[in-house]
Amino acid sequence: MTAQQASDPTSFFPQRHRVHARGWINDPNGIHKNGDTWHVYFQWNPHSARHDRIHWGHVVSKDLVHWEERPAAIIPREGEADSAGCWSGVGLVDRGPGAAEGGTPTLVYSGVEEANPQFASAIVARGNSNESLFDHFTVAAPAPDIEGHGPSTFRVGKLSSR
């Protein structure tokens, strides 16, 4: 072991299986390609090693081998439908009517409220072209009451385009 390796705890992290140097990390979400860049988002709590107030971490790659860490893409927003966490979801580049030239990066995820943590709403986050900023959020569907299941079983699962 070199002195540099000893001083950098991330030097032994796997290179092809993404891990994070800090906090709780969970399943990948919103994996998609925008232009020549792959975007992988993942459930992450950067403040603790506990599964709590989940953010969406973000890494990018041109070749799916070498990865670059980006700032968190989605974070819980106080007083909003995702104030207790940003859970599972999907990602895509919207090229439909009204989208920006080249498409609008869009993430759709389950948001959980502090006041009702057992209920999840479908939230749409739209971003800028390089996906470094998601700043337009819309609650697309409030927590549904699915007969026989209740609103606590809802999760955003799949989107398709025509």
Language model: regions and residue ranges:
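Beta-rich carbohydrate-recognition and catalytic domains
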Residues: 1-162
